[in-house]
Regions:
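N-terminal small-domain helix-loop-helix segment of the aminotransferase-like
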Residues: 2-88, 371-372
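PLP-dependent aminotransferase-like
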Residues: 73, 101-159, 180
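PLP-dependent enzyme catalytic core of the Aspartate aminotransferase-like
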Residues: 77, 148, 316, 325-334, ...
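Active-site pre-lysine segment of PLP-dependent enzymes
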Residues: 122, 129, 140-153, 165-188, ...
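Helix C-cap/helix->beta junction micro-motif
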Residues: 124, 184-185, 295, 330, ...
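Active-site PLP-lysine loop of aminotransferase-like
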Residues: 210, 214-229, 239-256, 338-339
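Structural signature of PLP-dependent enzymes
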Residues: 244-248, 266-289
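Conserved glycine-rich beta-strand-loop-beta hairpin in the small C-terminal domain of fold type I
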Residues: 264, 280-289, 300-313
Length: 372
């Protein structure tokens, strides 16, 4: 089996530890262990004192009952037994695609998007066609393109919402139409929902609550600010959950027992995390928008209150060279747009510490001025 190099992950693996001002990541500023445990007034010592004599044995195969119940409560129609714990959303996507896609299948994805959603199907022998998001259309999903691409042999439509890297959302009306199109050919719809928006005016809806063959993947990495515990999940109906169980045994035995505990703790206190993160997004997005308004060499379609944005750069050199030179000269890290097959752009993660964002943007402006 052949698979393409994973552009974003390869870039970050090579360069992120050299960054002084990392404005490339797409998570919201990570919680410390003390902050996470302290959400309900518990201190770290107390939290671990209760667990110090527990054996570090295998955990729950599919996630603890408490975990499954907390995750199921995030949806309107999903039963706890149909939640399967995974190693982050990447593990959830891998599980779903590994279970469903076969050589000769037809898959529809979007571009740009998270590379996993189309290169895993390609590696399994599927043909992949793309709905191309266009900057001049504010990166909005084109339903007419989707209708033209879907065919009787289409097995699955693989998307993400909000989109990585652009931060744009598949709103309720669009999602319902996607389900309607998929239903005409009995195709599955997988949506990576790891960037569920924090302020959406009721426009965000999970695919699993819209479509009987919908697959929602998600994790605690982005919206919930704890990527380090590596906990994600699939949410589906009962038939798909049963299919996934068989394949999951080959990809993951269980999550860590402490990770499951911390995940449950986070989900039980999710309103406090979301309140904190709404504040970070609102304040930092205002900083980003003001910077863009004053920066003549940058354009931005504003993200939908999610933690990733995608800027257009007016530069002469290729974006990868630009980003390497920027990092080496200033310590500022971006992800070049070419990692998403869109050159002359860059992913800018604006939900880091405010001081990091402000200094990073200032240095980026100084570097852009030198390009004249």
């Amino acid at each position: 089996m052949e698979i393409a190099n994973f552009g974003v992950e390869e870039w970050l693996n090579k360069w992120e530890k050299k960054a002084v001002y990392d404005i490339a990541q797409s998570s919201i500023e990570a919680l410390t262990l003390d902050e996470l445990v302290g959400l309900d007034g518990t201190n770290v010592s107390e939290f671990f004192e209760k667990r110090k004599n527990e054996p570090l044995d295998y955990g729950w195969i599919e996630g603890s009952d408490a975990f499954k119940q907390e995750v199921a409560s995030l949806y309107q129609t999903v039963d706890p037994e149909n939640i399967l714990q995974t190693n982050g959303a990447t593990g959830a996507n891998l599980l779903a695609l590994y279970a469903l896609v076969e050589a000769g299948d037809h898959v529809v994805s979007m571009l740009p998007t998270y590379q996993q959603l189309y290169d895993i199907p390609k590696s399994l022998g599927a043909t992949v066609d793309f709905v191309h998001l266009k900057e001049e259309a504010d990166w909005q999903f084109d339903l007419e393109q989707l209708e033209a691409l879907v065919k009787p042999e289409t097995k699955i439509i693989c998307l993400n919402s909000a989109n990585n890297p652009t931060g744009t959302l598949l709103n309720r009306k669009t999602l319902e139409k996607i389900a309607e199109i998929a239903r005409t050919v009995d195709a599955y719809v997988l949506i990576d929902e790891v960037y569920a928006p924090l302020t959406d005016n009721g426009e965000f809806l999970s695919i699993v609550d819209v479509y009987e063959k919908g697959i929602a993947t998600n994790s605690l990495s982005k919206t919930y600010s704890i990527p380090g515990i590596r906990i994600g999940w699939t949410a589906t109906g009962p038939e798909l959950a049963e299919v996934f169980r068989k394949y999951r045994d080959y990809t993951m035995i269980c999550g860590g027992v402490l990770s499951d505990d911390l995940a449950v703790h986070a989900l039980k206190n999710k309103e406090k995390i979301l309140e904190r993160n709404k504040k970070i997004i609102t304040e930092n997005l205002a900083i980003l928008k003001q910077w863009v308004a004053n920066e003549p060499k940058v354009e931005l379609v504003a993200p939908n209150y999610v933690s990733t944005s995608f800027i257009k750069l007016t530069i002469e050199e290729d974006d990868q060279t630009f980003c390497i030179n920027l990092l080496e000269e200033t310590g500022v890290l971006l992800v070049p747009g070419s990692a998403f097959d869109l050159p002359k752009h860059a992913r800018l993660g604006y939900c880091c510490k405010k001081e990091t964002l402000e200094k990073g943007l200032s240095l980026l402006s100084e570097f852009l001025k030198k390009q004249d």
